[in-house]
Amino acid sequence: MSDIQLYLLEADSSNKTEAQGIAARTASRLQQKTLKLIDLVTSLEPHINDKDNGSIRANSVAYLADVIAALPLKVLSVQERRLLCDFILGRLEGDTEGVGASARALVALEGLGKWDTPTAQKVLRAFLDNTHPLRQFKLQTERYAVVQLIDLLVAKYRDAMRKLHNDDHEFMAGFISYWEGEKDPRNLMIIFSLLQVPMTEWDVHAHAQDLFDSVFNYFPITFKPPPDDPYGITSQDLKNRLRDCIAANSDFAPYAFPQLLDKLDSTSMNTKRDVLQALQACITDYEAKTINLYSVTLWDALKFEILNVQEEDLAEEALTSLALLAAKFSYFGEGPLNAYLRPIIKECNEHLEDAPTKQSEAAGRILHALVSSAPQAADKVSKGILPVLFALYNGSESITRRRGLLQAFNQITGGFEKMTGEIPGADCKALQAFADDALAAMVRALVSAPKAEVSFRMASLTGLAQLVSVPGLLSDKQINQAVDTVTNLVLHEQLQGHGDIRTPAIKALSSMALNVPQAVRDRSVPAFMVELPDVPEGDVVPSTVLEAFAQLAAEGQIFDTVVLRLKNKLRSVRHQGASLAYQRALLFAMLYAFTFGSPARDDGVIRSAYYADYADPLTIDFVKDVSSETDPVAVDVVGRIANIILRPQSVHLQSTVYHKAREWLSPANADESGASQHTTPFLLYFYAAMRPEVVEAADVVSMLKAQTVSALSAWASSQAVVTTLRLVSLLVNKFANPKTMQATLAEAGLDVEILTHDSPSAEAIQAAFAVTKGLLIQGKSGSLTTRYLQTLLDLLSGPNSTTTAQNFTTLLAPDEILSKENHCLISGLSQQKLFNQAIPTLTTAIRTATPAQKPAYLTALTGLLRHLPYTLLSPSLTLLTPPLLQTLDLTSSTPDQAAKASALIIFESALMHDAPILTEHTSSLITRLLNSTSTSANGAGVRAKALQCLALVPRQLKREAVVPFRREVVRRLLACLDDGKRSVRGEAVRCRTAWLGLDEGGEEED
């Protein structure tokens, strides 16, 4: 069989891949000269001219298209390509079967060599004359190929296509009507795109309405893509293309604006959004002289969306449209701008006379949008509004009226702030003329207005910050007055509850620090220092002043000033022997500044000089200085500050710091100086900051040995032990070599199997869990971790089972130290590994354990589950439900309360996501939940959570399963309604309502 016959056979059976392979082989023969083009065309004749079968004719053309598409460049000569082009176009005159394949063949031919102008014009003419309208072809794939071809012609042969239009006045009418009725989104995406070429580049004035109508017929787009749409075309894609068409030519304005504004009255919010976005595109792209004809009409329509807000985003879009209009006219001429702004200013002034109202608030938003658009608009709005606004303000004694006017003024100032930020050096003289009046009014409001007038004072505070933020608006004297007013507010206003505006005042002062940092340094910082004496009277810590001062560090312009003053004050305080609480407060302020402030950065990394300037001196004062007055809290805070600065630094800088500190940090020196215990909090954060490659292996072993001694010491404080164990987990996770892990642990005295051998102490058990936690999260020592986990599980059957069980919750408990930010090794499979090994062992042991052993296993199980995601537990819920129910029977001790809380959280998730699994346990679950609501054996947290779970039961489980328990549940919930805790009583009310809703046969409960 010939290639064409094979192709037709495969095409008929819809085996597209095999058919294309046959065409590719034909193309290869053409390339190798074993087949001549004339022979190829001749072989097509009996099939391409088959009068009885249109499918064969179409597939024959498709074969030719696939062959041409598979040909490399330079195989066909110019003459051969021209002959093929004529052959394909000639077919269209008498037979349009396979029109899509014809289009594909022509696209492939064009890819082999660019056409000349006559050829390109002839191709377009042939399709417009012989396939008009395109919608006559029912298959989208055929229309799509034609659309792609014409898009290619319009994009690559712009001059040739424009010449067709210029030479034939009837061409455009046919071109426009060619696309009528197309509905497929893939085709429309290309059609909207190709139509923009004549819309923007050709003279289409005579055809503007037809061209506009051809696309506006699709407005608004209501297309919703089907699920799993392989083409990825969204409704927004179509909207964007259509919007570009509507805004493509100013000649469309007489048709676009009336029709868009008519659709703005639609009750559909989506239609309104599309209209407003289309209006914005038109305003942006149409010529200013054209838009000028419609400016007042547009204002009348847009103001409705702002003055009568239906949806907030619609109001924002309308405001954006008004701003675009103002910006357009600002650079076109004074006449159009005046004509546009005059009615707006008049109406806004009228609304301000009635302030405060929703309309006056909307007027303020309108003024903000106009002022922020351009300097020219800002100047005219200010001159038209501000005289009236301040006349109204000064003529009124009503604080409410003044507040509304001040809020409108703030909108104008905010507009200037935005505009000057986008256009540096913009003129603000119109606003400057009223700056003194505004400043005086705001200062007077903050100082003299009744404290209960919170909104009035807040408006004044906001206004002061905005006045300062507008470049060049205020004189130095005025800036100082504004800064002093806000500073005094922060420092001296002591009002609590309603009327307290210190927090926003601190934010306002931070804002001023951004815009006028020198004024804040010169005025505010000294004022804060006055309120921070070296030795406070009566040892009263000025905590509110410190909190406010530390928050100023959020602004990078004065960060260095804030932390330097805090450091110097801390030194003075220590020198004067002030209270430990005061020193702590200053340290916490520095920590806050470095944590939440804006320190200087080099290449995105916090500046390394901060370590030498701040962390190092603090370390010398609070960590290296060993005395009876050493404060573990201060040591901890200094460690945190050092961690923040060191953590992102390079290996080189960290190595320099580490080797400098290595001598005094070494365990031997620490023991000699007596610093071993009190430096541990610092060591924890110091080593957390270090990259793994910085610390030497020998140092790791010696440090682990020292921590082993501390961890196993029965005399150490509980907090010191916790810190030591966290450090052990960190050292094991990050610095110990996984290849020599067991040897390292054995040398340090931390081998878990040895630690737990022969009735281990509580301290040894805790150390074993700390080591295992570091290994588990690391995930690099799999077999060793498995052995250690099994060793810990075996301890649950020993004499120290209670202590062991309580420690299982630590294995996956979150720890800020063990994080990727601290360069730790974090395995994504640690939770899964622990679950797979521990949970089956524990559930099996619970089934066979004696009553005395069971509480330990239940505590261990819930301790592990507490920190596992529900998605990990869900597949094993059937296995876990019985032991979790037994957990709810535990006694009232503190560990048991934690176990109960963990079980209840899991039941809550199960009821919400996997309720059918719990159906068979309905009776046991309800009984135990009711028992957990009693006050005698359960804490308030457990009681509240049990009630939350109980409330889910009638909603999530089958009605017939829970109705029998309704009467008993409602009766026992009466006691919960008298619970001593309000939170529990609230949950009891909600739970009882849920159960009463079951409506058991119309019976009513008392």
Spell out what each predicted region is:
Residues 864:
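Phosphate/NTP-binding elements of NTP-utilizing enzymes
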Residues 895:
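An aromatic- and glycine-enriched ligand-binding surface/loop that stacks and positions planar moieties
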Residues 2-52, 56-841, 849, 853-860, ...:
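Structural marker for long, regular alpha helices in very large eukaryotic proteins
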Residues 954-955:
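Charged/polar low-complexity intrinsically disordered segments, enriched in acidic residues
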